[in-house]
Amino acid sequence: MEFHFDATFFAFVGLILFLALVVYLKVPGMMARSLDDRADQIRNELAEAKRLREEAQHLLAEYQRKRKEAEAEAAHIVAAAEREAEMLTAEAKKKTEEFVANRTALSEQKIKQAEADAMKAVRSAAVDLAIAAAETVLAKKADGKVQSELFGNAVGQVKTRLN
């Protein structure tokens, strides 16, 4: 049996020695551990990403709920403001109508009072004129006896009216 020590043989021996050295230094275990660590790290990152995604979805749902609540509250506030504005408008209209009615009634009352005062003044002036005319007529036509009798009758009428 003859051995040929050519380059192929030495390459094979080198390969065997290299593999023995790799096994002796526990390189496959270190590689497996490194790959396991990397797999664990990736698994943890995926779990963290899933947790963050769920948290983001929860926050999104919460913000959407809060937005809907805020929109509902804003709609409620707007509706309340509209109702209050309508009430204030109706109240202002009612007060304005009452004010106009009061002013109209007061003006009508003043007009009636002015008419009554004018009628009294006209009557008083007519009475004064009639008295003056009667006095003038009586002064010209009546003598002393008739004047005394008229004066007595007038005083008697005044006494009866005062009592």
Curated annotation (Swiss-Prot):
It is a single-pass membrane protein. One of its GO terms (molecular function) is proton-transporting ATP synthase activity, rotational mechanism. The chain crosses the membrane at residues 5-25. GO terms for cellular component: plasma membrane; proton-transporting ATP synthase complex. Keywords: ATP synthesis, Cell inner membrane, Cell membrane, CF(0), Hydrogen ion transport, Ion transport, Membrane, Transmembrane, Transmembrane helix, Transport. It is found in: Cell inner membrane. It holds the Pfam family ATP-synt_B. F(1)F(0) ATP synthase produces ATP from ADP in the presence of a proton or sodium gradient. F-type ATPases consist of two structural domains, F(1) containing the extramembraneous catalytic core and F(0) containing the membrane proton channel, linked together by a central stalk and a peripheral stalk. During catalysis, ATP synthesis in the catalytic domain of F(1) is coupled via a rotary mechanism of the central stalk subunits to proton translocation. F-type ATPases have 2 components, F(1) - the catalytic core - and F(0) - the membrane proton channel. F(1) has five subunits: alpha(3), beta(3), gamma(1), delta(1), epsilon(1). F(0) has three main subunits: a(1), b(2) and c(10-14). The alpha and beta chains form an alternating ring which encloses part of the gamma chain. F(1) is attached to F(0) by a central stalk formed by the gamma and epsilon chains, while a peripheral stalk is formed by the delta and b chains. This is ATP synthase subunit b 1. The lineage of its organism: Bacteria, Pseudomonadati, Pseudomonadota, Alphaproteobacteria, Hyphomicrobiales. The gene is atpF1.
